[in-house]
Amino acid sequence: MKEYNVLQYGAVGDGATNDAFAIQHAIDDCAKNGGGRVVLQSGYVFYSDSIRLRSNVDLHIQKGARLKATGNIDGYIRPNKLINDPKTALIGNPVTGKPSFVFLYGYEADGCTISGEGTIDANGHAFVQRKDQYYVTGDFYPRPTVIYVEKSNHITFKDITIVDPAPGRVRRCAY
């Protein structure tokens, strides 16, 4: 299996620089060349806006690596964007069954995989108004969904850890 290291695509992995472009470029190259593994290397924190998953690509987060979502909602993929009603496009879930904003998004991404013993940090607390040891308050929307995959077959999630998430789901996919 051919590997694509995101550091070779310009990712910094310092936990502050937005590495979305480098990660997405590696994923797109991998998919364009028939698939393989995109590696997020151990010892780095890759801070990122939304990432689009592709067919036959394994997004592999090594043990000791962290993929951390930015707190910038404007950098998130919006599955409802083409809906003509702006209120429905923002609210999403109760009306369309789709989330309004997504961190890791797969659409017609057959054979996509997220693997490795690393961590996906959804940075959910960046989207709330107040938190304490007992509860979190704030608007339900527009908290982003961590992973949303639709119209895809043979998807795999293996050995990953997800921390500080908002909701996530798999919809209309064959297993």
Model-predicted regions and their roles:
Residues 1-175:
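Extracellular/periplasmic carbohydrate-active domains that bind, remodel
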